[in-house]
A protein has these predicted regions:
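Terminal alpha-helical segments
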Residues: 1-162
């Protein structure tokens, strides 16, 4: 695969990542914890796909992305050992948020997941930035800072619904 194609695919995933982070900030502001969890998962997934594309690897599924992330980044030592486990837990939480109305999703859940996702995305951007594709992640880093700064408050404090 040529560099132009890889740059294009990584950039596409970074655009999706930026949009998820911006949507996350808006959903947190509205107190929509379920949507916030989904945004966090998709931000992590889009960062994963961008990482994989930076090595010329196309993920065919969410599970495939996790497997390839583990093989090419975790086992290689570029990402911490718990990365794939955290991504899997976040996927499970996203499934609950999207499909199980009887499962409560709280501001605390969002706070905990945000911390991990922010660290993961920062690491992914460092790896992509250190690569040879010459891709700028400025928009993602700006959206990441906004996602990190947005206040997460419980129902009575921030309004909205879970």
């Amino acid at each position: 695969m040529d560099k132009a194609t890889l740059r294009h695919e990584v950039s596409n995933n970074l655009t999706l990542l930026e949009e998820e982070l911006r949507s996350f900030a808006a959903n947190v502001g509205a107190g929509l914890w379920r949507k916030s969890v989904a945004n966090l998962y998709y931000a992590a997934y889009d960062a994963t796909c961008a990482l994989l594309w930076s090595k010329g690897i196309k993920a065919e599924s969410h599970e495939g992305a996790q497997s390839m992330l583990s093989l090419h980044f975790v086992k290689a030592g570029a990402m911490p050992k718990g990365t794939t486990k955290n991504l899997s837990l976040l996927l499970s939480l996203r499934h609950s948020a999207d499909y199980k109305g009887d499962v409560s999703i709280s501001a605390q859940d969002v706070l905990e997941q945000r911390k991990w996702v922010i660290g993961f995305v920062k690491s992914a951007m460092d790896i992509i930035g250190a690569g040879s594709l010459g891709i700028s992640a400025t928009a993602v880093l700006t959206a990441l800072k906004d996602a990190e700064r947005v206040a997460i408050k419980e129902h009575g404090e921030g309004g909205g619904r879970s």
